[in-house]
């Protein structure tokens, strides 16, 4: 069926339900007017339905007249009448059934509208709070929990001032420089308060326009927090500030508002010796708080798990595995919140490395550890990344929470096992054969098998990755030009396995200690993920 025919069928189906085609929107969607009638209701409300001509997107449904009996703020209904009846991304529209899908959306919208009219779903106001709290953006880069007065940096982006609240000006300034923002010497008086109550808008008198409105609203949520807010506003007034920014930390979200002091009015009132609290009439401006702290950036995609924030981790080898792996570790919080990520590699990036390395042509002939640290600092300015461009056998790594061997070199891996015995946890990650499989082994205590143990077991045919011998494939010419060929996708597989096991480690999951991911589908997996014992022949574990 053609797109035009499908649209015609949908419009005809809506026509049978009392809707009329009235034209197109500026972006080409089809507009229909009719009435949205809740189930078991006698009459409906005038509404507009906008249909995506491709039927990939949910129909937009907007009430043309908001019932006067509804409160100022209700769940799922915007100030312009826009109705949120389904969360985008929660359903997939069947583009081959446009009539059925579009009518189902209309029916769902009618059900939600009916619940709104019945005063149901009020609890959803807390989840939708930011839909009712529009304002100037303020960015928060705070890792500590300290309350009270905070530092606020004012920066310019394309001539527009932006506010950045921070507990570490150097760290935040680095982030702003990476964005190309110009840091000014201006500041805004800022206070941080905490509440145990989730915010939700009032169903009347919304949005708040004065300090009195804010305090009345907060009284319904947390009277103790209301008192703290009022104290900070009056403190700013005593400090002769032009305004004050109040940031409120609630259990699941951070929000705020700015208070603008009317100095001329205050002077006039002081002349009249007006002893009433003049702060209640001050104008307020809602602030949309955007978190940019490193803890949040790492935790956002893993809300119920620990991240690598605060850990001291070293990655030995910044080559085809270590480059991708270190990138993933930083995204998981490595090097942040007091932690440190150390990269060790004495080698330089050569042209033959670029095809399967995280770094690229601009880093040609650069030391891999230094170039990788520079790249990670560009991506995560708040992270502490240390580069050691030396042979790891001559490096002083200090006390570590986790040592990762990403070199893929057996002899060096054995040396690391002997030089960094338990209780230092060690993770070895490597690629077997020409990208046949990727493997990783975690050792957290003395009774665990080490990388050398696995070498002895493999010689006896135990704990191997595949049932057949590993293919011996080399490419290149001459002794110095030979190499094992495999694409960058194999390196990413290995790095992903290493990142997965690192996150398991920080969350207290140490088993299975040996994990294998088969890449070559022509081969058969020999050893399922398991916990190999110490090998009786290992000189490191039996000395």
UniProtKB/Swiss-Prot annotation:
Region spans: Adenylation plus E1-like domain: 306-543
The record describes its quaternary structure and partners as: Forms a Cap2-CdnA complex. A Cap2 dimer is bound on either side by a CdnA monomer.
Q: What is its EC number?
A: 2.3.2.-
Region (E2-like domain) residue ranges read 1-159
Q: What Pfam families does the record tag this protein with?
A: Prok-E2_B (PF14461), ThiF (PF00899)
Could you tell me which PANTHER family the record lists for this protein?
TRNA THREONYLCARBAMOYLADENOSINE DEHYDRATASE
Supply the name of the protein. ATP-dependent ubiquitin transferase-like protein Cap2
Molecular-function GO term, any one: ubiquitin-like modifier activating enzyme activity
Q: What does this protein do?
A: CD-NTase priming component of a CBASS antiviral system. CBASS (cyclic oligonucleotide-based antiphage signaling system) provides immunity against bacteriophages. The CD-NTase protein (CdnA) synthesizes cyclic nucleotides in response to infection; these serve as specific second messenger signals. The signals activate a diverse range of effectors, leading to bacterial cell death and thus abortive phage infection. A type II-A(GA) CBASS system. Acts as a protein transferase, conjugating CdnA, the CD-NTase, to unidentified target(s) in the cell probably via an E1-E2 ubiquitin transferase-like mechanism. This primes CdnA, upon phage infection CdnA activates and makes cyclic nucleotides. Protein conjugation requires ATP.
Q: Which residues form the active site?
A: 84 (for e2-like domain), 450 (for e1-like domain), 453 (for e1-like domain)
Keyword Nucleotide-binding attached: no
Read off the InterPro entries from this record: Prok-E2_B_dom, ThiF/MoeB/HesA, ThiF_NAD_FAD-bd, Ubiquitin-activating_enz
Q: What is known of its domains?
A: Has an N-terminal E2-like domain, a linker and a C-terminal adenylation plus E1-like domain, dimerizes via the E1-like domain.
């Amino acid at each position: 069926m053609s797109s035009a025919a499908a649209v015609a069928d949908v419009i005809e189906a809506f026509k049978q339900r009392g809707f009329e085609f009235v034209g197109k929107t500026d972006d080409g969607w089809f507009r229909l007017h009719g009435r949205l009638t809740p189930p078991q209701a006698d009459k409906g409300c005038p509404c507009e339905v906008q249909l995506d001509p491709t039927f990939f997107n949910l129909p937009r449904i907007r009430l043309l007249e908001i019932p006067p009996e509804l409160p100022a703020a209700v769940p799922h209904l915007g100030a312009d009448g826009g109705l949120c009846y389904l969360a985008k991304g929660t359903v997939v529209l069947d583009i081959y059934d446009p009539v059925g899908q579009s009518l189902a959306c209309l029916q769902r919208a009618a059900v939600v509208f009916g619940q709104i009219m019945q005063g149901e779903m009020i609890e959803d106001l807390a989840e939708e709070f930011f839909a009712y709290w529009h304002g100037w953006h303020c960015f928060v880069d705070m890792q500590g929990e300290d309350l009270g007065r905070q530092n606020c940096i004012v920066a310019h982006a394309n001539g527009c001032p932006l506010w950045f609240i921070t507990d570490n000006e150097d760290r935040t300034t680095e982030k702003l420089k990476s964005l190309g923002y110009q840091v000014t010497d201006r500041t805004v008086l800022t206070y941080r308060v905490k509440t145990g109550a989730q915010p939700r808008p009032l169903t009347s008198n919304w949005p708040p326009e004065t300090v009195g409105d804010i305090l009345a609203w907060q009284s319904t949520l947390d009277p103790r927090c209301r008192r703290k807010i009022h104290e900070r506003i009056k403190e700013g007034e005593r400090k002769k500030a032009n305004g004050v920014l109040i940031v409120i930390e609630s259990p699941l979200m951070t929000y705020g508002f700015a208070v603008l002091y009317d100095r001329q009015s205050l002077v006039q009132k002081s002349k009249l010796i007006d002893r009433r609290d003049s702060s209640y009439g001050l104008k307020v401006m809602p602030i949309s708080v955007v978190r940019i702290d490193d803890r949040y950036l790492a935790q956002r995609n893993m809300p119920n798990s620990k991240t690598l924030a605060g850990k001291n981790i070293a990655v030995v080898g910044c080559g085809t595995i270590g480059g991708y792996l270190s990138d993933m570790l930083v995204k998981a919080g490595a090097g942040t919140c007091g932690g440190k990520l150390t990269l060790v590699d004495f080698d330089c990036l050569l042209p033959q490395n670029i095809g399967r390395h995280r770094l690229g042509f601009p880093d040609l002939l650069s030391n891999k550890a230094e170039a990788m640290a520079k790249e990670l600092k560009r991506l995560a300015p708040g992270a502490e990344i240390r580069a050691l461009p030396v042979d790891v056998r001559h490096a002083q790594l200090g006390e570590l929470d986790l040592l990762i061997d990403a070199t893929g070199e057996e002899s060096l891996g054995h040396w690391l096992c002997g030089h960094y015995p338990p209780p230092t946890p060690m993770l070895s990650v490597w690629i077997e054969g020409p990208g046949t499989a990727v493997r990783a082994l975690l050792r957290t205590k003395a009774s665990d098998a080490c990388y050398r143990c696995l070498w002895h077991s493999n010689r006896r045919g135990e704990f191997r990755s595949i049932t057949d011998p590993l293919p011996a494939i080399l490419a290149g010419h001459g002794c110095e030009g030979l190499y094992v060929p495999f694409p960058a996708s194999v390196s990413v597989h290995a790095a992903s396995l290493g990142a997965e096991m690192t996150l398991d480690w920080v969350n207290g999951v140490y088993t299975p200690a040996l994990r294998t991911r088969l890449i070559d589908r022509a081969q058969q997996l020999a050893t399922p993920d398991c916990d190999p014992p110490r090998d009786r022949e290992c000189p490191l574990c039996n000395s």
